[in-house]
Amino acid sequence: MSKIKETEIDYEEVERRIEVKELTNEIDTPDGIINFLEKRNGIHNFDFRNRYSVLDLVHCQRKSYYKQLGVKQEELLADVSGMWVTVRGDLLHEMTHAYKWREMDMEYKVTLDDGREATVAGRLDMYDWKTKTIIDLKTTKTVRWQIKHGILPRLEHILQVQCYYTMFSDVIPVENLNLVYADMQDIVTYRVKKNDLSGWIKTRIKDIEDSITRKSTPSGETSGLCQFCKYQSRCFDDGNGIEHKPLSAPKKKEDNENGS
C-alpha cells in the first residue's frame, strides 16, 4: 500500500488570501482608461454626427461641414518645415507637465432648436488650481515678429480659451484665462477676458447644421491655416474658398484599399 505524502498547509497564507478576497471585488476597468487606450489605437465608438471639437467651432466652418459629412481627408504634400513644426510642437508641449492638472477633457452638451443634442469636446492644456487659471499653450514660430505685425494674438485663439471657460466653469472654479505663445526663443502670455460663449457656440453649430440640411456648402473662412488643411482640393473645387494651388491631394486608391 502506497503512502500519500502529506502537503504542509500554510494557514497564515490561507488567512491572508481570505482577507484580501473580503477586502476587494473585481469590477469593470474605468471608462477613462478604456477611452485613453481606444484613442491611442485609433478606435472611436462615438457618432461623429452632431459632435464637434472646440477647434471645429473657432476655425473654418467649411472644414467642420466637410467633417460632419464624412468627407475623406486628403494627404498633405509634406515638407521638411512641416515635420519640424510637429517636432517643435511636441518639444514645447512638454511644458504642460509643469502643472499636475493638465490635458483635462470635457464634453459640453448643446440643445438645438429642433430638440437634437450636439456635443462639444474640449481639452485644457493646463489648469493652475492655486490661482484658478485656465492656461492654453500655442506653439508657433517668430512669436515676437508676429506680435509686432499684429498677427498675434489671434481671434480664434481667444475664442478657444473663452469656449473652455464656458465649458469648464460649472465644473472647476475659473478666475483667469491665460493664452501662452511660445517658440524656441520666446514665451509671451496674454490675459484673456472671461466671456460666456454659450450662445455663440449654439449659433456656430446651428449654422453648420443648417448648411448640411440645405446641402449648401458654406463659404471658406480662409487664413494662413489653410495650408495645413486636409480638404484643400475639395475646398478649391467648391469655390468661395482657397484660391492658391491645393497643398493636399486625395489619397491614392491603393492607400485607401490598405486602410492607410
Predicted regions and their residues:
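Short connector loops/turns at beta-strand edges and beta->alpha or beta->beta junctions
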Residues: K138-T142, A182-Q185
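Short, conserved glycine- and acidic-residue-centered signature motifs
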Residues: P153-Q160
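A generic fold-level signal
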Residues: T119-A121, E156, E221
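Active-site-adjacent bridging/hinge elements
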Residues: I134-D136, R204
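Metal-dependent nuclease catalytic cores that hydrolyze phosphodiester bonds in DNA/RNA
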Residues: M1-I134, K141-K148
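Metal-dependent nuclease catalytic regions and adjoining charged, substrate-binding loops involved
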Residues: S2-T29, I151, C163-S260
